[in-house]
Amino acid sequence: MNKLIILGLACIIAVASAMPYGPGDGHGGGHGGGHGGGHGNGQGGGHGHGPGGGFGGGHGGGHGGGGRGGGGSGGGGSPGHGAGGGYPGGHGGGHHGGYQTHGY
């Protein structure tokens, strides 16, 4: 019985780790990292990594660059994900696997 429980848990972990990003993980990580710095004074970039990477990387980069009045280019996403636009000016998040994340 214990062996079956351990085997079941191992299967769940294997499937979860094979997913490109977990439910909400990638988006939450990226948005938190980039958004916090970008809206303040335009200096903060921050790579949106997050446990899931993926969508989170591109989205986090897009918020990073410009401040509230600034514009300018956004910070880079996590490695492999494109840079995003600045807060008021750039409009366009990073690319990840052909999907464009939304910039602000």
UniProtKB/Swiss-Prot annotation:
Residue segments, region Disordered: 22-104
One GO CC term on file: extracellular region
Signal peptide: 1-20
Biased composition (Gly residues): 23-97
A single GO BP: innate immune response
Keywords recorded for this protein, A-Z: Antibiotic, Antimicrobial, Fungicide, Immunity, Innate immunity, Repeat, Secreted, Signal
Subcellular compartments: Secreted
18 X 4 AA approximate tandem repeats of H-G-G-G: annotated segments: 27-98
Top-level taxonomic group: Eukaryota
Sequence repeat locations: 27-30, 31-34, 35-38, 39-42, 43-46, 47-50, 51-54, 55-58, 59-62, 63-66, 67-70, 71-74, 75-78, 79-82, 83-86, 87-90, 91-94, 96-98
Task of the protein: Has antifungal activity against C.albicans.
Family membership: To T.molitor tenecin 3.
Protein name: Holotricin-3
Origin organism lineage: Eukaryota, Metazoa, Ecdysozoa, Arthropoda, Hexapoda
